[in-house]
Amino acid sequence: MLNQDFQHLREQHTIASPIAFVGIGLHSGRRVIMRILPAGADTGISFTRRDLPEGENRFVALWNRVDGTELCTTLSNRHGHHLATVEHLLSAFSGLGIDNAAVAVDGPEVPVVDGSAMPFVSALINAGIRPLGTPRDLLVIRRPVRIQQGESWAELLPDHTLRVTVSIDFHQQDIGLQCLSMCVSPNTYSREIASARTFGFAENVWQLRRRGLALGGSVKNAILLENGRVANMEGLRFPDEFVRHKALDAIGDLALAPAPIIGHYRANRPGHRLNNDLLRLLMSDERSWQRVAAADLLDGKINGLDQAMLGIGLEEATYGSDTSHAVRSEKLSTWREALDRVLGRTDGDTP
């Protein structure tokens, strides 16, 4: 019997009622009004800029529409217009399993709210998440893909769920070396990732603002580090809040794939450019992924895949919180063998 926690993965979802936000753009510094509206099945996440002429103001949230990755993820459209800082909202949609929504903003940037995704998550949950009765597809990673830029690298590996493993290493005393690894589900996302805030360094602020960036940044919407120490009076929400925010960003950037990814994202010192380049590399090689119906995977209908071998959703539901490393390894080995059969891999194909 399939665990009840997995049922939401079978079909697409939207929100049950509209949501409104008023906030500041992190980089533009402009006041922004944003509304999020329910949307029909198979429409995906779309954005509209209400300050632009009709017919030129629509943006589609897809990997190949990204046109800027400096300090945020920026979408563009065929008319040459841009919409910046979409990653935190996309992360919230993805983390909660929302496939379809229409977002309207009255400026060039999504509001930063408190620098995390938690205000979005809270509002989306309060609005209600509504199933649409339409099957959901998943993008299953078949073969590893990896990209490296200097000391930074990122890769996607076959796995039973969306798992993120991120490491960062900063010389600032209050950051240092931090690592995080977890399966992503609505529960784990809301509890462990969504409230982690973006961060910046006091020594960079003047230079960024000269370039028209970080004009709306403050300790109200970011962690500020000064001389290596956290300057925010309230301190950190997690001891490793910095790497948790990197995971939050990665989930938002990966949400630009054409369907929710089932695979293991691993990265060292990632950024928005690295994440988007990884998606571009993935999509350029059709051997590295397969688009499948979520229900078929969950029900074991694809070449006899047993539903218990593809525990999508909660890490506790997959292994149990007290499962030993040896048992985990045995389960993963069994799962990988099943996945090889499902995807038609032979021993010679296995990376």
Residue ranges, per PLM feature:
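C-terminal regulatory domains involved in ligand/effector binding and gene-expression control
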Residues: M1-N100, A104-P351
